[in-house]
């Protein structure tokens, strides 16, 4: 069964490359058997990024004579956001087609058309759907098998609603998969187009059992948020599945660039309102990140008396609350007195805004749990130090990547609030643990209000103010050259891109 799931994932890997950089894929395949060391390095770097653009350096081309087109291959070359917005304003009936998360925008004469994913990528989605059905026939879990069949149908229609409901309803499955176009990280033009991502997962029952404390209080944290009552959805944030998984195979959006250690899905606000979301924590990826990246960076950049505070348990708690917090806050924006999609309202900067909201509301939630006596207040130093060490790791990506954009903004805000200070003599950073809760609460209020109002201008101005890498931090990060930027997963299943 796992082999069939991986086979389906390899088909979606082939689709992701065509969403990201079809020309880069041609070069990747051409270099596959080249013996030269330079060719091998280029081949491997193409694999890391799923394109000829460095996803962690603002899509900077790393191949000669290449130019990055915003939105990757999801839009026509040379198109601008203004051109799309002007076209839709003149042709309002085309808005749903052009702005759909599941269409590739193309030119047709003087018009713009949205080609459905299931049409554009049909030659890979058909075999992927077959492999999912084959896997379903091999599963002894009836609910999981039913989900796989529904997801196979969804691949061929771009309608994921029914299969998403079935996925959220899975009860402690031994095996699970993420298998859909969910995230919009490739779309830095409109911020609405999704890319395919896959994770084949095996449940870690012991670690999953530890999540019960967090699950119990999700609704209470939602009620406690610094947000007007009418902007708090009635069901979003209520207890939903939370699983710790090991992922022996990932592809597509989950394979290239930033290596996620957790996910909170689906992103469909209808599912949020009806069911909530499922939170997945990739234990094998988290272990690698913390041990090989986060802890070493903390020891280099944090003041010596705080450098040993970040921990695996602290980082896990921060990540758990981050993923829970993706499902907290407003499900829609209020724009001109009407309900509007938050992604569409905020635009391309939405991904960074949402990652920041999840970070900060997550810390706010940890404060709430400590203040209510659910978690010991003695853990506060551990939680804050683990998050700040994580910031240092993330901003090494450059501030164009969504998570890095979010955490660069957080860092600068905390510095402004004196919750983080720098020792000019040593160049190391320290946390003022007395000031951090207030800074977290005020930032949570700002980010939640931006999402609730759908105020794109306010969002862009906020990130412009706080989104620049300070020179002193850039200098400090130069000392971390021997620490990996991220983990580079190696799978025994192979890539097998077609």
Q: PLM ranges: what are they?
A:
Residues 80-81, 204, 262, 376, ...:
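Helix N-terminus capping/helix-initiation residues
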Residues 444-498:
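Extended, compositionally biased alpha-helical segments that mediate assembly or anchoring
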Residues 363-460:
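Long, well-structured alpha-helical subdomains associated
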Residues 7, 82-90, 212, 216-219, ...:
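Polar/charged alpha-helical tracts
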Residues 9-11, 21, 35-38, 69-72, ...:
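Serine/threonine-rich low-complexity intrinsically disordered regions
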Residues 4, 87-352, 356-368, 373-391, ...:
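Fold-level signature of zinc-dependent metallopeptidase catalytic domains
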């Amino acid at each position: 069964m796992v082999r069939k799931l991986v086979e389906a994932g390899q088909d979606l890997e082939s689709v992701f490359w065509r969403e990201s950089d079809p020309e880069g894929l041609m070069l990747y395949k051409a270099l596959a058997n080249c013996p030269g060391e330079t060719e091998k390095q280029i081949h491997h770097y193409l694999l890391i990024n799923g394109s000829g653009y460095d996803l962690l350096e603002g899509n900077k081309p790393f191949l000669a004579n290449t130019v990055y087109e915003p939105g990757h291959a999801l839009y026509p070359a040379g198109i601008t956001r203004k051109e799309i917005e002007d076209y839709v304003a003149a042709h309002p009936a085309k808005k749903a087609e052009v702005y759909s998360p599941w269409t590739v925008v193309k030119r047709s004469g003087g018009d713009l058309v949205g080609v459905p994913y299931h049409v554009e990528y049909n030659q890979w989605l058909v075999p992927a759907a077959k492999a999912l059905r084959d896997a379903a026939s091999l599963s002894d879990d009836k609910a999981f098998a039913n989900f796989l069949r529904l997801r196979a149908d969804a691949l061929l229609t771009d309608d994921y609603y029914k299969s998403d409901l079935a996925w959220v309803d899975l009860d402690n499955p031994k095996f699970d998969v993420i298998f859909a176009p969910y995230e919009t990280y490739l779309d830095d033009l409109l911020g609405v187009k999704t890319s395919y991502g896959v994770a084949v997962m095996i449940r870690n029952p012991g670690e999953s059992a530890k999540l019960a404390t967090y699950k119990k209080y999700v609704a209470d944290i939602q009620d406690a948020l610094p947000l007007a009552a009418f902007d708090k959805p009635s069901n979003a944030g209520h207890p939903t599945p939370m699983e710790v998984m090991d992922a022996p195979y990932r592809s597509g959006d989950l394979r290239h660039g930033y290596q996620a250690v957790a996910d909170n899905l689906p992103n469909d606000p209808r599912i949020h309102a009806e069911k909530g979301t499922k939170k997945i924590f990739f234990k094998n990826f988290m272990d690698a990140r913390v041990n090989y990246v986060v802890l070493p960076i903390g020891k280099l950049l944090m003041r010596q008396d705080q450098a040993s505070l970040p921990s695996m348990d602290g980082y896990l708690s921060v990540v758990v609350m981050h993923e829970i917090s993706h499902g907290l806050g407003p499900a829609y924006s209020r724009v001109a007195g009407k309900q509007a999609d938050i992604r569409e309202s905020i635009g391309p900067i939405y991904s960074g805004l949402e990652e920041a909201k999840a970070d900060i509301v997550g810390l706010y939630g940890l404060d709430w749990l400590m203040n209510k006596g659910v978690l010991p207040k003695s853990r506060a130093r551990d939680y804050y130090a683990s998050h700040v060490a994580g910031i240092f790791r993330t901003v090494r990506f450059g501030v164009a990547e969504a998570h890095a954009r979010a955490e660069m903004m957080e860092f600068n805000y905390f510095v402004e609030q004196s919750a983080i200070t720098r020792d000019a003599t040593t160049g190391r950073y320290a946390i003022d643990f007395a000031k951090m809760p207030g800074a977290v609460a005020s930032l949570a209020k700002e980010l939640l209000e931006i999402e609730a109002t759908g105020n794109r201008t306010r969002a862009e101005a906020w990130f412009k103010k706080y989104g620049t890498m300070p020179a002193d931090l850039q200098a400090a990060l130069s000392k971390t050259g021997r620490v990996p930027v991220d983990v580079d997963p190696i799978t025994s299943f192979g890539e097998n891109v077609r």
